[in-house]
């Protein structure tokens, strides 16, 4: 747990024990691997830093990245084994804008490269605000008009690109699926939104059109949850709405538990573990 632009980090283990430590610069982004390795992007005085810490708060790696050389970091994701870090950069050169997706390795391949970077790609005239691993051997980069799938190994290679013809409103990604809500600006009432789910090979699994306003998109166990301030619905991967409910209390947050139809719902003054069906 860390506050954006702060310097303090609190790491909770499975037993509820908390460890706290501080870093030198304000935190821009943070990711944690399953075994407790922490990857950070820090905002320094003359550039940004990518730093890696183990579960005992020992600094493993510190890499300085500057806007002139690399661009501005937009998003990061750490592989579950803590060995690979995926970074999306926004590169501005005069009036030209491009995105750069870079893969860093903290094992032998990264050491051999000199700067830990083992591969990357540039994408012209697009902004990529989200990158995510889908397991340790595959990854996805999501831009404002496209989605790019990668294979990750000793380097990174492009496998497939899917272009979008509608505005991306929301994104959710896990190890197996990438879910989107697209907004059709031409429609103002019925079926303004379209929820779409892809698997990690890029195959479209389902499409579901809806009109109700929402502010949160979640991927559950082969189901999609769409939540607004006072309502939520669950759509299965066949595109059928299985559940729809209005709540009396305002929903602040909903989090999946990893079990089908079970979600942790946070209201303004309470939190409940609920089975939604």
Label every model-predicted segment:
Residues 1, 25-36, 69-78, 118-134, ...:
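Repeated scaffold domains used in trafficking and secretory/extracellular systems
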Residues 2, 40-41, 86-88, 141, ...:
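Residue position within the beta-strands of beta-propeller blades
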Residues 155-156, 163, 169-175, 182-277:
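Hydrophilic extracytoplasmic domains
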Residues 7-11, 46-52, 93-105, 145-151, ...:
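Structural motif
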Residues 15-22, 59-66, 112-122, 156-162, ...:
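A short beta-strand motif characteristic of beta-propeller blades
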Residues 13-16, 53-58, 106-109, 152-155, ...:
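Short loop/turn segments that connect beta-strands within beta-propeller blades
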Residues 1-7, 11-13, 19-23:
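N-terminal "mature head" segments of proteins
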Residues 40, 45-147:
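Solenoidal tandem-repeat scaffolds enriched in leucines and small polar residues
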């Amino acid at each position: 747990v860390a506050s954006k632009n702060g310097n303090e980090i609190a790491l909770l283990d499975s037993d509820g024990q908390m460890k706290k430590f501080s870093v030198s610069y304000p935190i821009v982004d943070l990711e944690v691997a399953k075994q407790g390795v922490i990857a950070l992007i820090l905002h320094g005085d003359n550039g940004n830093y990518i730093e890696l810490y183990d579960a005992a708060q020992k600094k493993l790696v510190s890499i300085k990245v500057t806007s002139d050389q690399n661009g501005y970091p937009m998003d990061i994701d750490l592989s579950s084994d803590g060995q690979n870090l995926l970074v999306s950069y926004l590169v501005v050169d005069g009036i030209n804008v491009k995105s750069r997706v870079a893969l860093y390795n903290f094992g032998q391949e990264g050491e051999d490269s000199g700067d830990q970077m083992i591969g990357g790609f540039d994408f012209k005239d697009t902004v990529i605000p989200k990158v995510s691993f889908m397991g340790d051997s595959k990854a996805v980069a999501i831009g404002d008009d496209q989605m790019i799938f990668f294979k990750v190994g000793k380097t990174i290679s492009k496998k497939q690109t899917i272009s979008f013809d509608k505005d991306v409103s929301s994104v959710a990604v896990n190890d197996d699926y990438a879910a989107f809500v697209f907004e059709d600006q031409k429609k103002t009432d019925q079926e303004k939104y379209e929820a779409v789910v892809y698997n990690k090979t890029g195959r479209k699994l389902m499409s579901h059109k809806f009109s109700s306003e929402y502010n949160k998109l979640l991927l559950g166990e082969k189901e999609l949850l769409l939540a607004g301030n006072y309502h939520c619905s669950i759509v299965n991967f066949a595109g059928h709405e299985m559940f729809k409910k209005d709540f009396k209390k305002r929903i602040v947050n909903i989090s999946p538990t990893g079990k089908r139809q079970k979600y942790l719902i946070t209201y303004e003054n309470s939190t409940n573990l609920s089975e939604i069906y």
